[in-house]
A protein has these predicted regions:
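Basic, helix-initiating cap at the start of DNA-binding domains
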Residues: 1-32, 49-52
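Solvent-exposed, amphipathic alpha-helical segments
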Residues: 11-18, 61-72, 182-186
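An extended, acidic
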Residues: 84-210
Length: 210
């Protein structure tokens, strides 16, 4: 049941904010969500399954946020604004979102503290009847995977109609990857406020921002 699943994930997230993952009890998560413990196990299979589902949801939410940042404000029919501005806004959003969410920060850097769940990134055997859990039991994105996922989304959004010359598309892809890698480095070692934009202005090819 999607609603019950989301309630359970919300409850697990709230529990994780208050105590280390090792101290989070399945029975408490179920009670907080207002469902039976059996419903919790039916949905996720195990505590590790719940951890994988949490990470999968945070990864999906983060990538959705990246797409919103890339699209920018205003009428979506008018197309994206200047690529440099959108890449800068996206890089700043990436850093801010990671700063505010320890689970996202761990996914992007690969540094999982003892307070957090740390499920294996490789796929695990799944016997779940829930499609969402079968997906969560599949491979989870590594920091390197995030670089490719965000870069490809940036190229798709900023490339517009896709009618650009191959050389322009390749340059855009390089600029997008550079912006993503710079943003992720800033997640690990945050710079001063506003420094991300200054760094991007210094390193992005001027032609790609026209």
């Amino acid at each position: 049941v999607p609603a019950a699943r989301e309630s359970l994930l919300d409850a697990a997230c709230s529990a994780l904010e208050r105590r280390p993952w090792s101290a989070v009890r399945m029975v408490d998560v179920a009670a907080s969500a207002g469902v039976s413990r059996q419903t919790l196990y039916n949905e996720f299979g195990s505590k590790d399954g719940l951890a994988r589902a949490l990470v999968r949801r945070e990864a999906d939410g983060y990538l959705a946020g990246v797409e919103r940042a890339l699209s920018g404000p205003g009428d979506p029919r008018s197309g994206p604004s200047d690529p440099h501005e959108r890449l800068t806004a996206t890089a700043e959003w990436m850093m801010s979102a990671a700063h505010d969410n320890a689970l996202v920060r761990a996914m992007l850097t690969g540094c999982w503290s003892e307070r957090l769940p740390s499920p294996a990134l490789s796929a695990v055997p799944s016997s779940s009847a829930a499609p969402a859990q079968r997906r969560a039991d599949g491979p989870l994105p590594s920091p390197g995977d995030f670089v490719g996922l965000v870069r490809d989304r940036a190229v798709a959004v900023l490339g517009g109609s896709g009618r650009s010359a191959p050389s322009d598309t390749a340059e855009l892809a390089r600029s997008c990857e550079l912006a993503v890698r710079l943003a992720l480095s800033c997640v690990a070692a945050p710079p001063a406020e506003g420094a991300v934009a200054d760094l991007l202005r210094a390193v992005l090819p001027r032609r790609s921002t026209a």
